[in-house]
Amino acid sequence: VTGVQTCSLPILTPVFHYGYEPFFTKCEEVGINGIIIPDMPYEEKGELNDIARSHQVDVISLIAPTSEQRIQKIAADAEGFIYLVSSLGVTGVRSEIKTDLDSMIAAIRKVTDIPVAVGFGINTTDQAANIAKIADGVIVGSAIVKMIAKYGTHAEQHIYTYVRMMKEAVMTANK
């Protein structure tokens, strides 16, 4: 719908209680054009997706390691971009990514050319560079949250330096 620029990542319960229509009206008003709801099963996104579309908001699909058939089913219906989950389990920093991302991206590419961004545990420049070689984007979240927890009100410079290093790793990998 929009070529996602600004995303929000809420859990489903507050969105449901607030109401889909008022929630997506507010998203449109403030310029959020993509939403990732990590606890919403793919099979349950129908009604929410219709309302989101009416407000120019893409519901971003998450694809976790699963069968090729399910990967392709979710990918064929995706909009904005695909959030490819790098590992099973809870989010957070991981020392290594063991999932066969190449095969998952190949399965996605059989049904769509929508951008694929990989996240879930990405925290080192080496991980970011390696993922940037095969995916369209790299998502880093928990590592930044940990910096905020560690440095509090003094986190800004640490985050800036970290994000700059991650960006350089991604840009270098894409040359």
Predicted regions and their residues:
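Short, small-residue-biased leader/transition segments that mark boundaries at the very start
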Residues: 1-9
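Glycine-enriched alpha-helix->loop->beta-strand junction motifs that scaffold or abut catalytic
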Residues: 27-33, 53-59, 77-84, 134-137
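Catalytic cores of alpha/beta
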Residues: 66-76, 118, 122-138
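Conserved, mostly hydrophobic/aromatic
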Residues: 27, 74, 108, 131, ...
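Glycine-rich phosphate-binding active-site loops on the catalytic face of alpha/beta enzymes
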Residues: 32-36, 41-44, 84-92, 121, ...
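Active-site beta->alpha loop and helix N-cap motifs at the rims of alpha/beta catalytic domains
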Residues: 8-37, 168-173
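Active-site-adjacent beta->alpha loops and helix N-cap segments on the catalytic face
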Residues: 15-22, 37-54, 67-73, 92-106, ...
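Surface-exposed amphipathic alpha-helices with a cationic face
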Residues: 28, 49-53, 102-112, 163-174
